[in-house]
Regions:
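Glycine-rich flavin
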Residues: 1-10, 26-33, 38-183
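Glycine-rich Rossmann-fold phosphate-binding loop(s) that bind the pyrophosphate
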Residues: 16-20, 40-41, 189-192
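Short glycine/serine/threonine-rich phosphate/pyrophosphate-binding segments
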Residues: 19-27, 46, 194-204
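A generic secondary-structure micro-motif detector
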Residues: 14, 93-94, 188
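Generic signature of intrinsically disordered, low-complexity, basic-rich segments
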Residues: 15-16, 116
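Rossmann-like NAD(P)H-binding beta-loop-alpha module
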Residues: 178-206
Length: 206
């Protein structure tokens, strides 16, 4: 049987440093709550590193390439866009670096949030056990817990997929950044927002 602590180390513990976790921690800290944010990977989570930010940067470049090809729609002469795929991806990573300080440990620490790098495990409704990146353990009690751990791409068990090789919406940004040219062909599995954005962007980039 669980026993509610008589007093708490924190008002709020947030597990996950992505968009939802950062907003939760920010609002709580603004209300002068004692907040700890726990993140085991990159601050900013999916949105900054693999989702919203890089995809919108890619979409912008792809849109410009599309408009150059279809200049007559705007009363302009058309032409084939001349670009470097490597430079397009380099710009994407540059945009990530520009936005990253807004989601950084340093910024959230300055806002009054304690940021811990490590893995969290909830042991009861008020207790979180944290294995820090340096190998040490820390246990904190809290009045409330926000679980904002996000999700990962699902790789379907398709025959031959491992042999052919694939990227996910997480890994393509680093893998494609090493290419001088866009892949000659690309199959996108998944018709959700991420799949549609990537399919359109890479089609427009050739």
């Amino acid at each position: 049987k669980w026993h509610r602590p008589a007093k708490f180390d924190r008002n709020l513990i947030v597990i996950g440093g992505g968009a939802a976790g950062l907003v939760s921690a920010y609002i709580a800290a603004a209300l002068k709550a004692k907040v700890t944010l726990i993140e085991n990977h990159k601050m900013g989570g999916d949105c900054l590193n693999y989702g919203c930010v890089p995809s919108k940067a890619l979409i912008k470049s792809a849109k410009l390439a599309h408009q150059i090809r279809n200049g007559e729609h705007y009363g302009l002469n058309t032409g084939a866009p001349d670009f470097s795929f490597r430079k397009v991806l380099a710009r994407v990573h540059g945009v990530i670096r520009t936005v990253a300080p807004h989601d950084s440990v340093e910024r959230y620490t300055s806002l009054g949030v304690e940021v811990l790098q490590g893995y969290a495990r909830i042991t009861d409704p008020w207790t979180v056990e944290i294995k820090l990146d340096d190998g040490t353990m820390q246990t904190l009690t809290t009045r409330s817990i926000v679980i904002a751990t996000g999700a990962r791409p699902f790789v379907p068990p398709l025959p031959g997929l491992e042999e052919v090789g694939y990227v996910t919406s997480d890994t393509l940004w680093s893998t494609f950044a090493e290419l001088d040219e866009a892949p000659k062909s690309l199959v996108v599995l998944g018709g959700g927002p991420i799949g549609c954005e990537l399919a359109q962007s890479f089609a427009r980039l050739g």
